[in-house]
UniProtKB/Swiss-Prot annotation:
Subcellular location: Secreted, Extracellular space, Apoplast; Secreted, Cell wall
Domain of life: Eukaryota
Pfam families: Glyco_hydro_32C (PF08244), Glyco_hydro_32N (PF00251)
Signal sequence region: 1-28
Keywords of the record: Apoplast, Cell wall, Disulfide bond, Glycoprotein, Glycosidase, Hydrolase, Secreted, Signal
Annotated consequence of substituting D282F: Loss of activity
Protein name: Beta-fructofuranosidase, insoluble isoenzyme CWINV1
Reaction(s) this enzyme catalyzes, per UniProt: Hydrolysis of terminal non-reducing beta-D-fructofuranoside residues in beta-D-fructofuranosides
Tissue specificity: Expressed in seedlings, leaves, flowers, and seeds.
Species: Arabidopsis thaliana (Mouse-ear cress)
SUPFAM superfamilies to which the protein is assigned, alphabetical: Arabinanase/levansucrase/invertase, Concanavalin A-like lectins/glucanases
Length: 584
């Protein structure tokens, strides 16, 4: 550890002590209460840490939630995040700050933004970074004022020559945007400003999540100088009945290829670009997106046919995943997606272990060639952690009811890629017309239920005798009798993940838009208490949190399996043990 990093940690701890003396407690639901209760935990984390991850981002201790303001500046990646310096539960929120040169290994810095003025004295909530045309980064974030109103503030670096951006200052003009009697904004539901974009009229635009009664909406503000903002008469988009829109994100994607697009770009001509509007629904705690067209004249987002911005929209991730945020990586011409994964353990367990929350591995995100969905894939940099590759698992036949153990890999901290080939598609069961909810299907037809084709996939974090395991698998159905159209279902079944009873063991599911006549790919990033699964080369993603009692460390096992009636071929299986990332 460098002298500079040690100094940073010292400053971080000093600020933590100072901050802890006056920051108020807030509840995790984002409600602010006049009478606050003690919800902090000051004891040291438990020495026994079987569930702490090896290569996912998480601070040394305490609560973490939303990723904030990710960006690249002078070749350095920055990740800010919502952090409680006083305990492993939500409250006392500040903007913690870490930097990296590769998105995998991270060094900490003192908190960048913390309550210090009337416009944020009751909390510094989520926001985003924008790189101005002169290369200067600025942050817009939500502050909680003395009246517990949500207002929007700006902060900028004190020293632009510092690539680590270790010190930030707040504008005396704050708050820049606030609810009042004229604009009629809901003062308790006005938060999480996006990265701003520059229109062709040279005005900046930013959207902020809000609601009016049950109408969720993205309020638009415009500005000529990034300091004086004016509310637009109409929102960028809204939906009646969806409830509060948190952590909105709005960005362009190219229709051709996987390269990213700068947020203010409109393409030449505009037809080569589409736009993505993503929201985090407070009611469901899931992230949804729609693909559509941005009307630059009316400042309106128009979803493509088949898309609706509500709970029926496609999701980034069908598991434990929320409050996501993208940024354009100008160094590698890609768009990167961050997302927060909360715990599935009890609050008491979180307090005992001394921490709560991780960030998923950053993902490259782009538009599928069909134009109907987004593709996600872990950034290439994570592959540098691969070691001890298991090879030559090719052309294996998995007969009905069989398992194939993968030896020679550290199964509790691994990266696995497998390619399946299905035989006899005509043997698939017919899906019931009422089966429209993939999670419900996966829950009712868990891994022990046989069907014509499936379940087949991977058993991860498994104990030797299968008292515990998490299964990630496919099933294939016919769309209807005598049909040559098929439905591919992907499940992540946590029901047998732990002998411990008080964990959330929800089973997750997603339909995968792929052709089952072609090989089916499945990738799993396994990291002690988290499993990130990518089906169909990133067309469906499911993140799970699990806490085995037996299948920990060297006692964890990995299997490929087929419990369907028909045989399945493993065309190729590669597995790697993963080194730990350097995350301080």
């Amino acid at each position: 550890m460098t002298k500079e990093v040690c100094s940073n940690i010292g400053l971080w701890l000093l600020l933590t002590l100072l901050i802890g003396n006056y920051v108020v407690n807030l509840e995790a639901s984002h409600h602010v209460y006049k009478r606050l209760t003690q919800s902090t935990n000051t004891k040291s984390p438990s020495v026994n840490q079987p569930y702490r991850t090896g290569f996912h981002f998480q601070p040394p201790k305490n609560w973490m939630n939303d990723p904030n303001g990710p960006m690249i500046y002078k070749g350095i990646y920055h990740l800010f995040y919502q952090w409680n310096p006083k305990g492993a539960v939500w409250g006392n929120i500040v903007w913690a700050h870490s930097t990296s040169t590769d998105l995998i290994n991270w060094d900490p810095h003192p908190p960048a933004i913390f309550p210090s003025a009337p416009f944020d004295i009751n909390g510094c909530w989520s926001g985003s970074a924008t790189i101005l045309p002169n290369g200067k980064p600025v942050i817009l974030y939500t502050g909680i004022d003395p009246k517990n109103q949500q207002v929007q503030n700006i902060a900028e670096p004190k020293n632009l020559s510092d690539p680590y951006l270790r010190e930030w200052k707040k504008s005396p003009l704050n708050p820049l945007m606030a609810p009042d009697a004229v604009n009629g904004i809901n003062a308790s539901s006005f938060r999480d400003p996006t990265t701003a974009w520059l229109g062709q009229d040279k005005k900046w635009r930013v959207i902020i999540g809000s609601k009016i009664h049950r109408r969720g909406l993205a309020i638009t503000y415009t500005s000529k100088d990034f300091l004086k903002w004016e509310k637009s008469p109409e929102p960028l988009h809204y939906d009646d009945g969806s409830g509060m829109w948190e952590c909105p994100d709005f960005f362009p994607v190219t229709r051709f290829g996987s390269n990213g697009v700068e947020t203010s770009s409109f393409g030449e001509p505009n037809e080569i670009l589409k736009h993505v509007l993503k929201i985090s629904l407070d009611d469901t705690k899931h992230d949804y997106y729609t693909i559509g067209t941005y009307d630059r004249v009316k400042d309106k987002f128009v979803p493509d046919n088949g898309f609706k911005m509500d709970g029926t929209a496609p999701r980034y991730d069908y598991g434990k995943y929320y409050a996501s945020k993208t940024f354009f990586d100008s160094a590698k011409n890609r768009r990167i997606l961050w997302g927060w994964t909360n715990e599935s353990s009890s609050v008491e367990d979180d307090v005992e272990k001394g921490w709560s929350g991780i960030q998923t591995i950053p993902r490259k995100i782009w538009l599928d060639r069909s134009g109907k969905q987004l593709i996600q894939w872990p950034v290439r940099e994570v592959e540098r952690l691969r070691t001890k590759q298991v090879k030559n698992l090719r052309n294996k036949v998995l007969k009905s009811g069989s398992r194939l153990e993968v030896y020679g890999v550290t199964a509790a901290q691994a990266d696995v890629e497998v390619l399946f080939k299905v035989r006899d598609l005509e043997k698939a069961d017919v899906i019931e017309p009422s089966w429209t909810d993939p999670q419900l299907i996966c829950s009712k037809m868990n891994v022990s239920v046989k069907s014509g084709l499936g379940p087949f996939g991977l058993m991860v974090l498994a104990s030797k005798n299968l008292e515990e395991y998490t299964s990630v698998y496919f099933r294939i159905f016919k769309a209807r009798q005598n049909s040559n159209k098929y439905v591919v279902l992907m499940c992540s079944d946590q029901s047998r993940s732990s002998l411990k009873e008080d964990n959330d063991k929800t089973t997750y599911g997603a339909f995968v838009d792929i052709n089952p006549h072609q090989p089916l790919s499945l990738r799993a990033l396994i990291d002690h208490s988290v499993v990130e699964s990518f089906g169909g080369k990133g067309r469906a993603c499911i993140t799970s949190r699990v806490y085995p009692k037996l299948a920990i460390g060297k006692s964890s096992h990995l299997f490929a399996f087929n419990y369907g009636y028909q045989s399945v071929d493993v065309l190729n299986l590669n597995a790697w043990s993963m080194n730990s990332a350097q995350i301080s």
